[in-house]
Every structure is written in C-alpha cells, then in structure tokens.
Amino acid sequence: MDENTDIQYSWFTKKFSALAGLDLAHYKCQQMKRRIKSYMQAKGASGFADFLKMLENNPVTVVDFKNFLTINVSYFFRDTDKWDEMSNNHVPALLSRKNTLAVWSAGCSIGCEPYTFAIMFEEMRKKHPLLKYSIFATDVDLEAVAAAKAGMYAGDALKSVRPELIRKYFTADPGGKHKINGSIANNIKFSLLDLHKGRFEGKYDIIACRNVVIYFEENIKYELYGKFHSALNPGGILFLGGSEIIFKSEELGFKNISMCFYQKV
C-alpha cells in the first residue's frame, strides 16, 4: 500500500477501535490490511471512509467484522492428538503434585475449548478420583462470550467429540443442536477480556491460548507470553496452537516440552 493508504488505514483503525473496542494496532499490519481489504471488497465498500460509515450504521456488520478479524473458528477437542497428550502426560504430571488445578482459556471464542477442558477432567476422574478443577475463560468478543455462556452447539462444533461423550455431557434439542450440561458449565467462569489491556489476575496450572495471537506483532506476542509466564504456577503448562512457537522461550523462563506445550521453569 502507498503512503496515503497507510494514513487512511491508521485513521480507520483508530476510528474502529473507538467504535468497537478492538485495537488493531497490536496486529501484524500487512496481514491485517489484507484481511480488512478482502472484507471491504466483499461488502462493496469503496474505501476506508465508506466502510466506516457502513459499520457506524449497522451494528450487525460490526459484530460480523470483529468475528472475521478475530477468527472465531472453534470446535471441541481441536487437534485431538494434543488433547490426548494433555490428558495422558501433562495433566497427570501436574496431579502428581496437587489435586486441584486452575485453568485459564485465554481467547475462548464460543466456549468449545473451556468446555473441552471440563469434559477431559471429568473423564480423567475415573483414574484420578481426587481431581478438582476450576476454569476461567475469556475473550475480547462480547458476542462470542455470550455464545459460550449459552453453551448451545451445532454439529460442526462437535465433529471431534466421541458419540458417547455427546450423550453423556450434552442434551439434544428438537432443532438438532446440543446444549452443554449444567454439571459441566458450573465449573467455568466466562468473562470479557482484551489480552492487550486487561490485567492478568490469579495463578494457573494451565493456560491455553491457541490460534489467538497468530496475527499479533512479534513484540506483542513476546510481551504476552511473558505475562502468561507470570500468571502460571511453577511447573505450569502453556498450551498453544499447532503453528505457534515461542522464539527464545528460555529467555522468558519456558521449557519447550513438546510441540504446542511449554512449561514454566
């Protein structure tokens, strides 16, 4: 993009931040520009000013655009092999030191990830009857958090869930959707939080931040991972997405124990 377009983009991001509460300055500039441009073209906007008018006049478009930018693609047991590794290796190692685990799902989207944690823990109680847990789940998107609290899911979100687990932990409705059972939902607290601005309170044994920061600038990622390190208990686990790597993780006090998993040392 030329200099004028850069100025227009900077102007738009400031206006959009004030309108929607999502600060785009922390995201990789060129990638975010391409995503916004593709969305603008799909909506028939002639430029940033025209697109801003569309957003100001249509709250539904604001929500849809935020979802587009924050990539609200979510389903239960995403990357099943990683969840198997979590339940077979990392959680038992944590339970060898304590019976009560605190989990934070940072960037929980519509709730599939924190509910997956809860289902995993419930199933693990067969071998670990003393296991207790609490789950804190946050997202920057108000609509996503509302959907997570509602706990109602269509078939695509359940594609990686074994049928017996669907029968055990969900209730089907006449429309073909499935609602998470209250016994699971009661162990999770959902909250609105911008990872760039919010304070990280509490201490956790597991923090999951998967496929959330892929468009963040590298310096923002590094700062965020440092804050996660501070929020973890000693020996705690940071669970990332399949394409995410912490460069120079040892400088932050992490040990890369396997793909997607970092341990606080």
Task: Please report, for each region that a protein language model flagged, where it lies by residue.
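Conserved AdoMet
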Residues: 1-104
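A structural alpha-helix within SAM-dependent methyltransferase catalytic domains
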Residues: 87, 91, 118-122, 229
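Conserved class I S-adenosyl-L-methionine
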Residues: 98-111, 116, 136
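Conserved SAM-binding loop of SAM-dependent methyltransferases across substrates and taxa
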Residues: 110-128
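Extended basic-aromatic, gly/pro-enriched interface segments that bind polyanionic ligands
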Residues: 126-127, 131-208, 212-220, 245-247, ...
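A short glycine-rich, Lys/Arg-flanked "PGG" loop and its adjoining helix->strand segment in the class I
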Residues: 222-234
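Conserved beta-strand signature within the Rossmann-like core of class I S-adenosyl-L-methionine
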Residues: 234-242
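Short hydrophobic/aromatic beta-strand or adjacent loop that forms the aromatic wall/cage
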Residues: 257-262
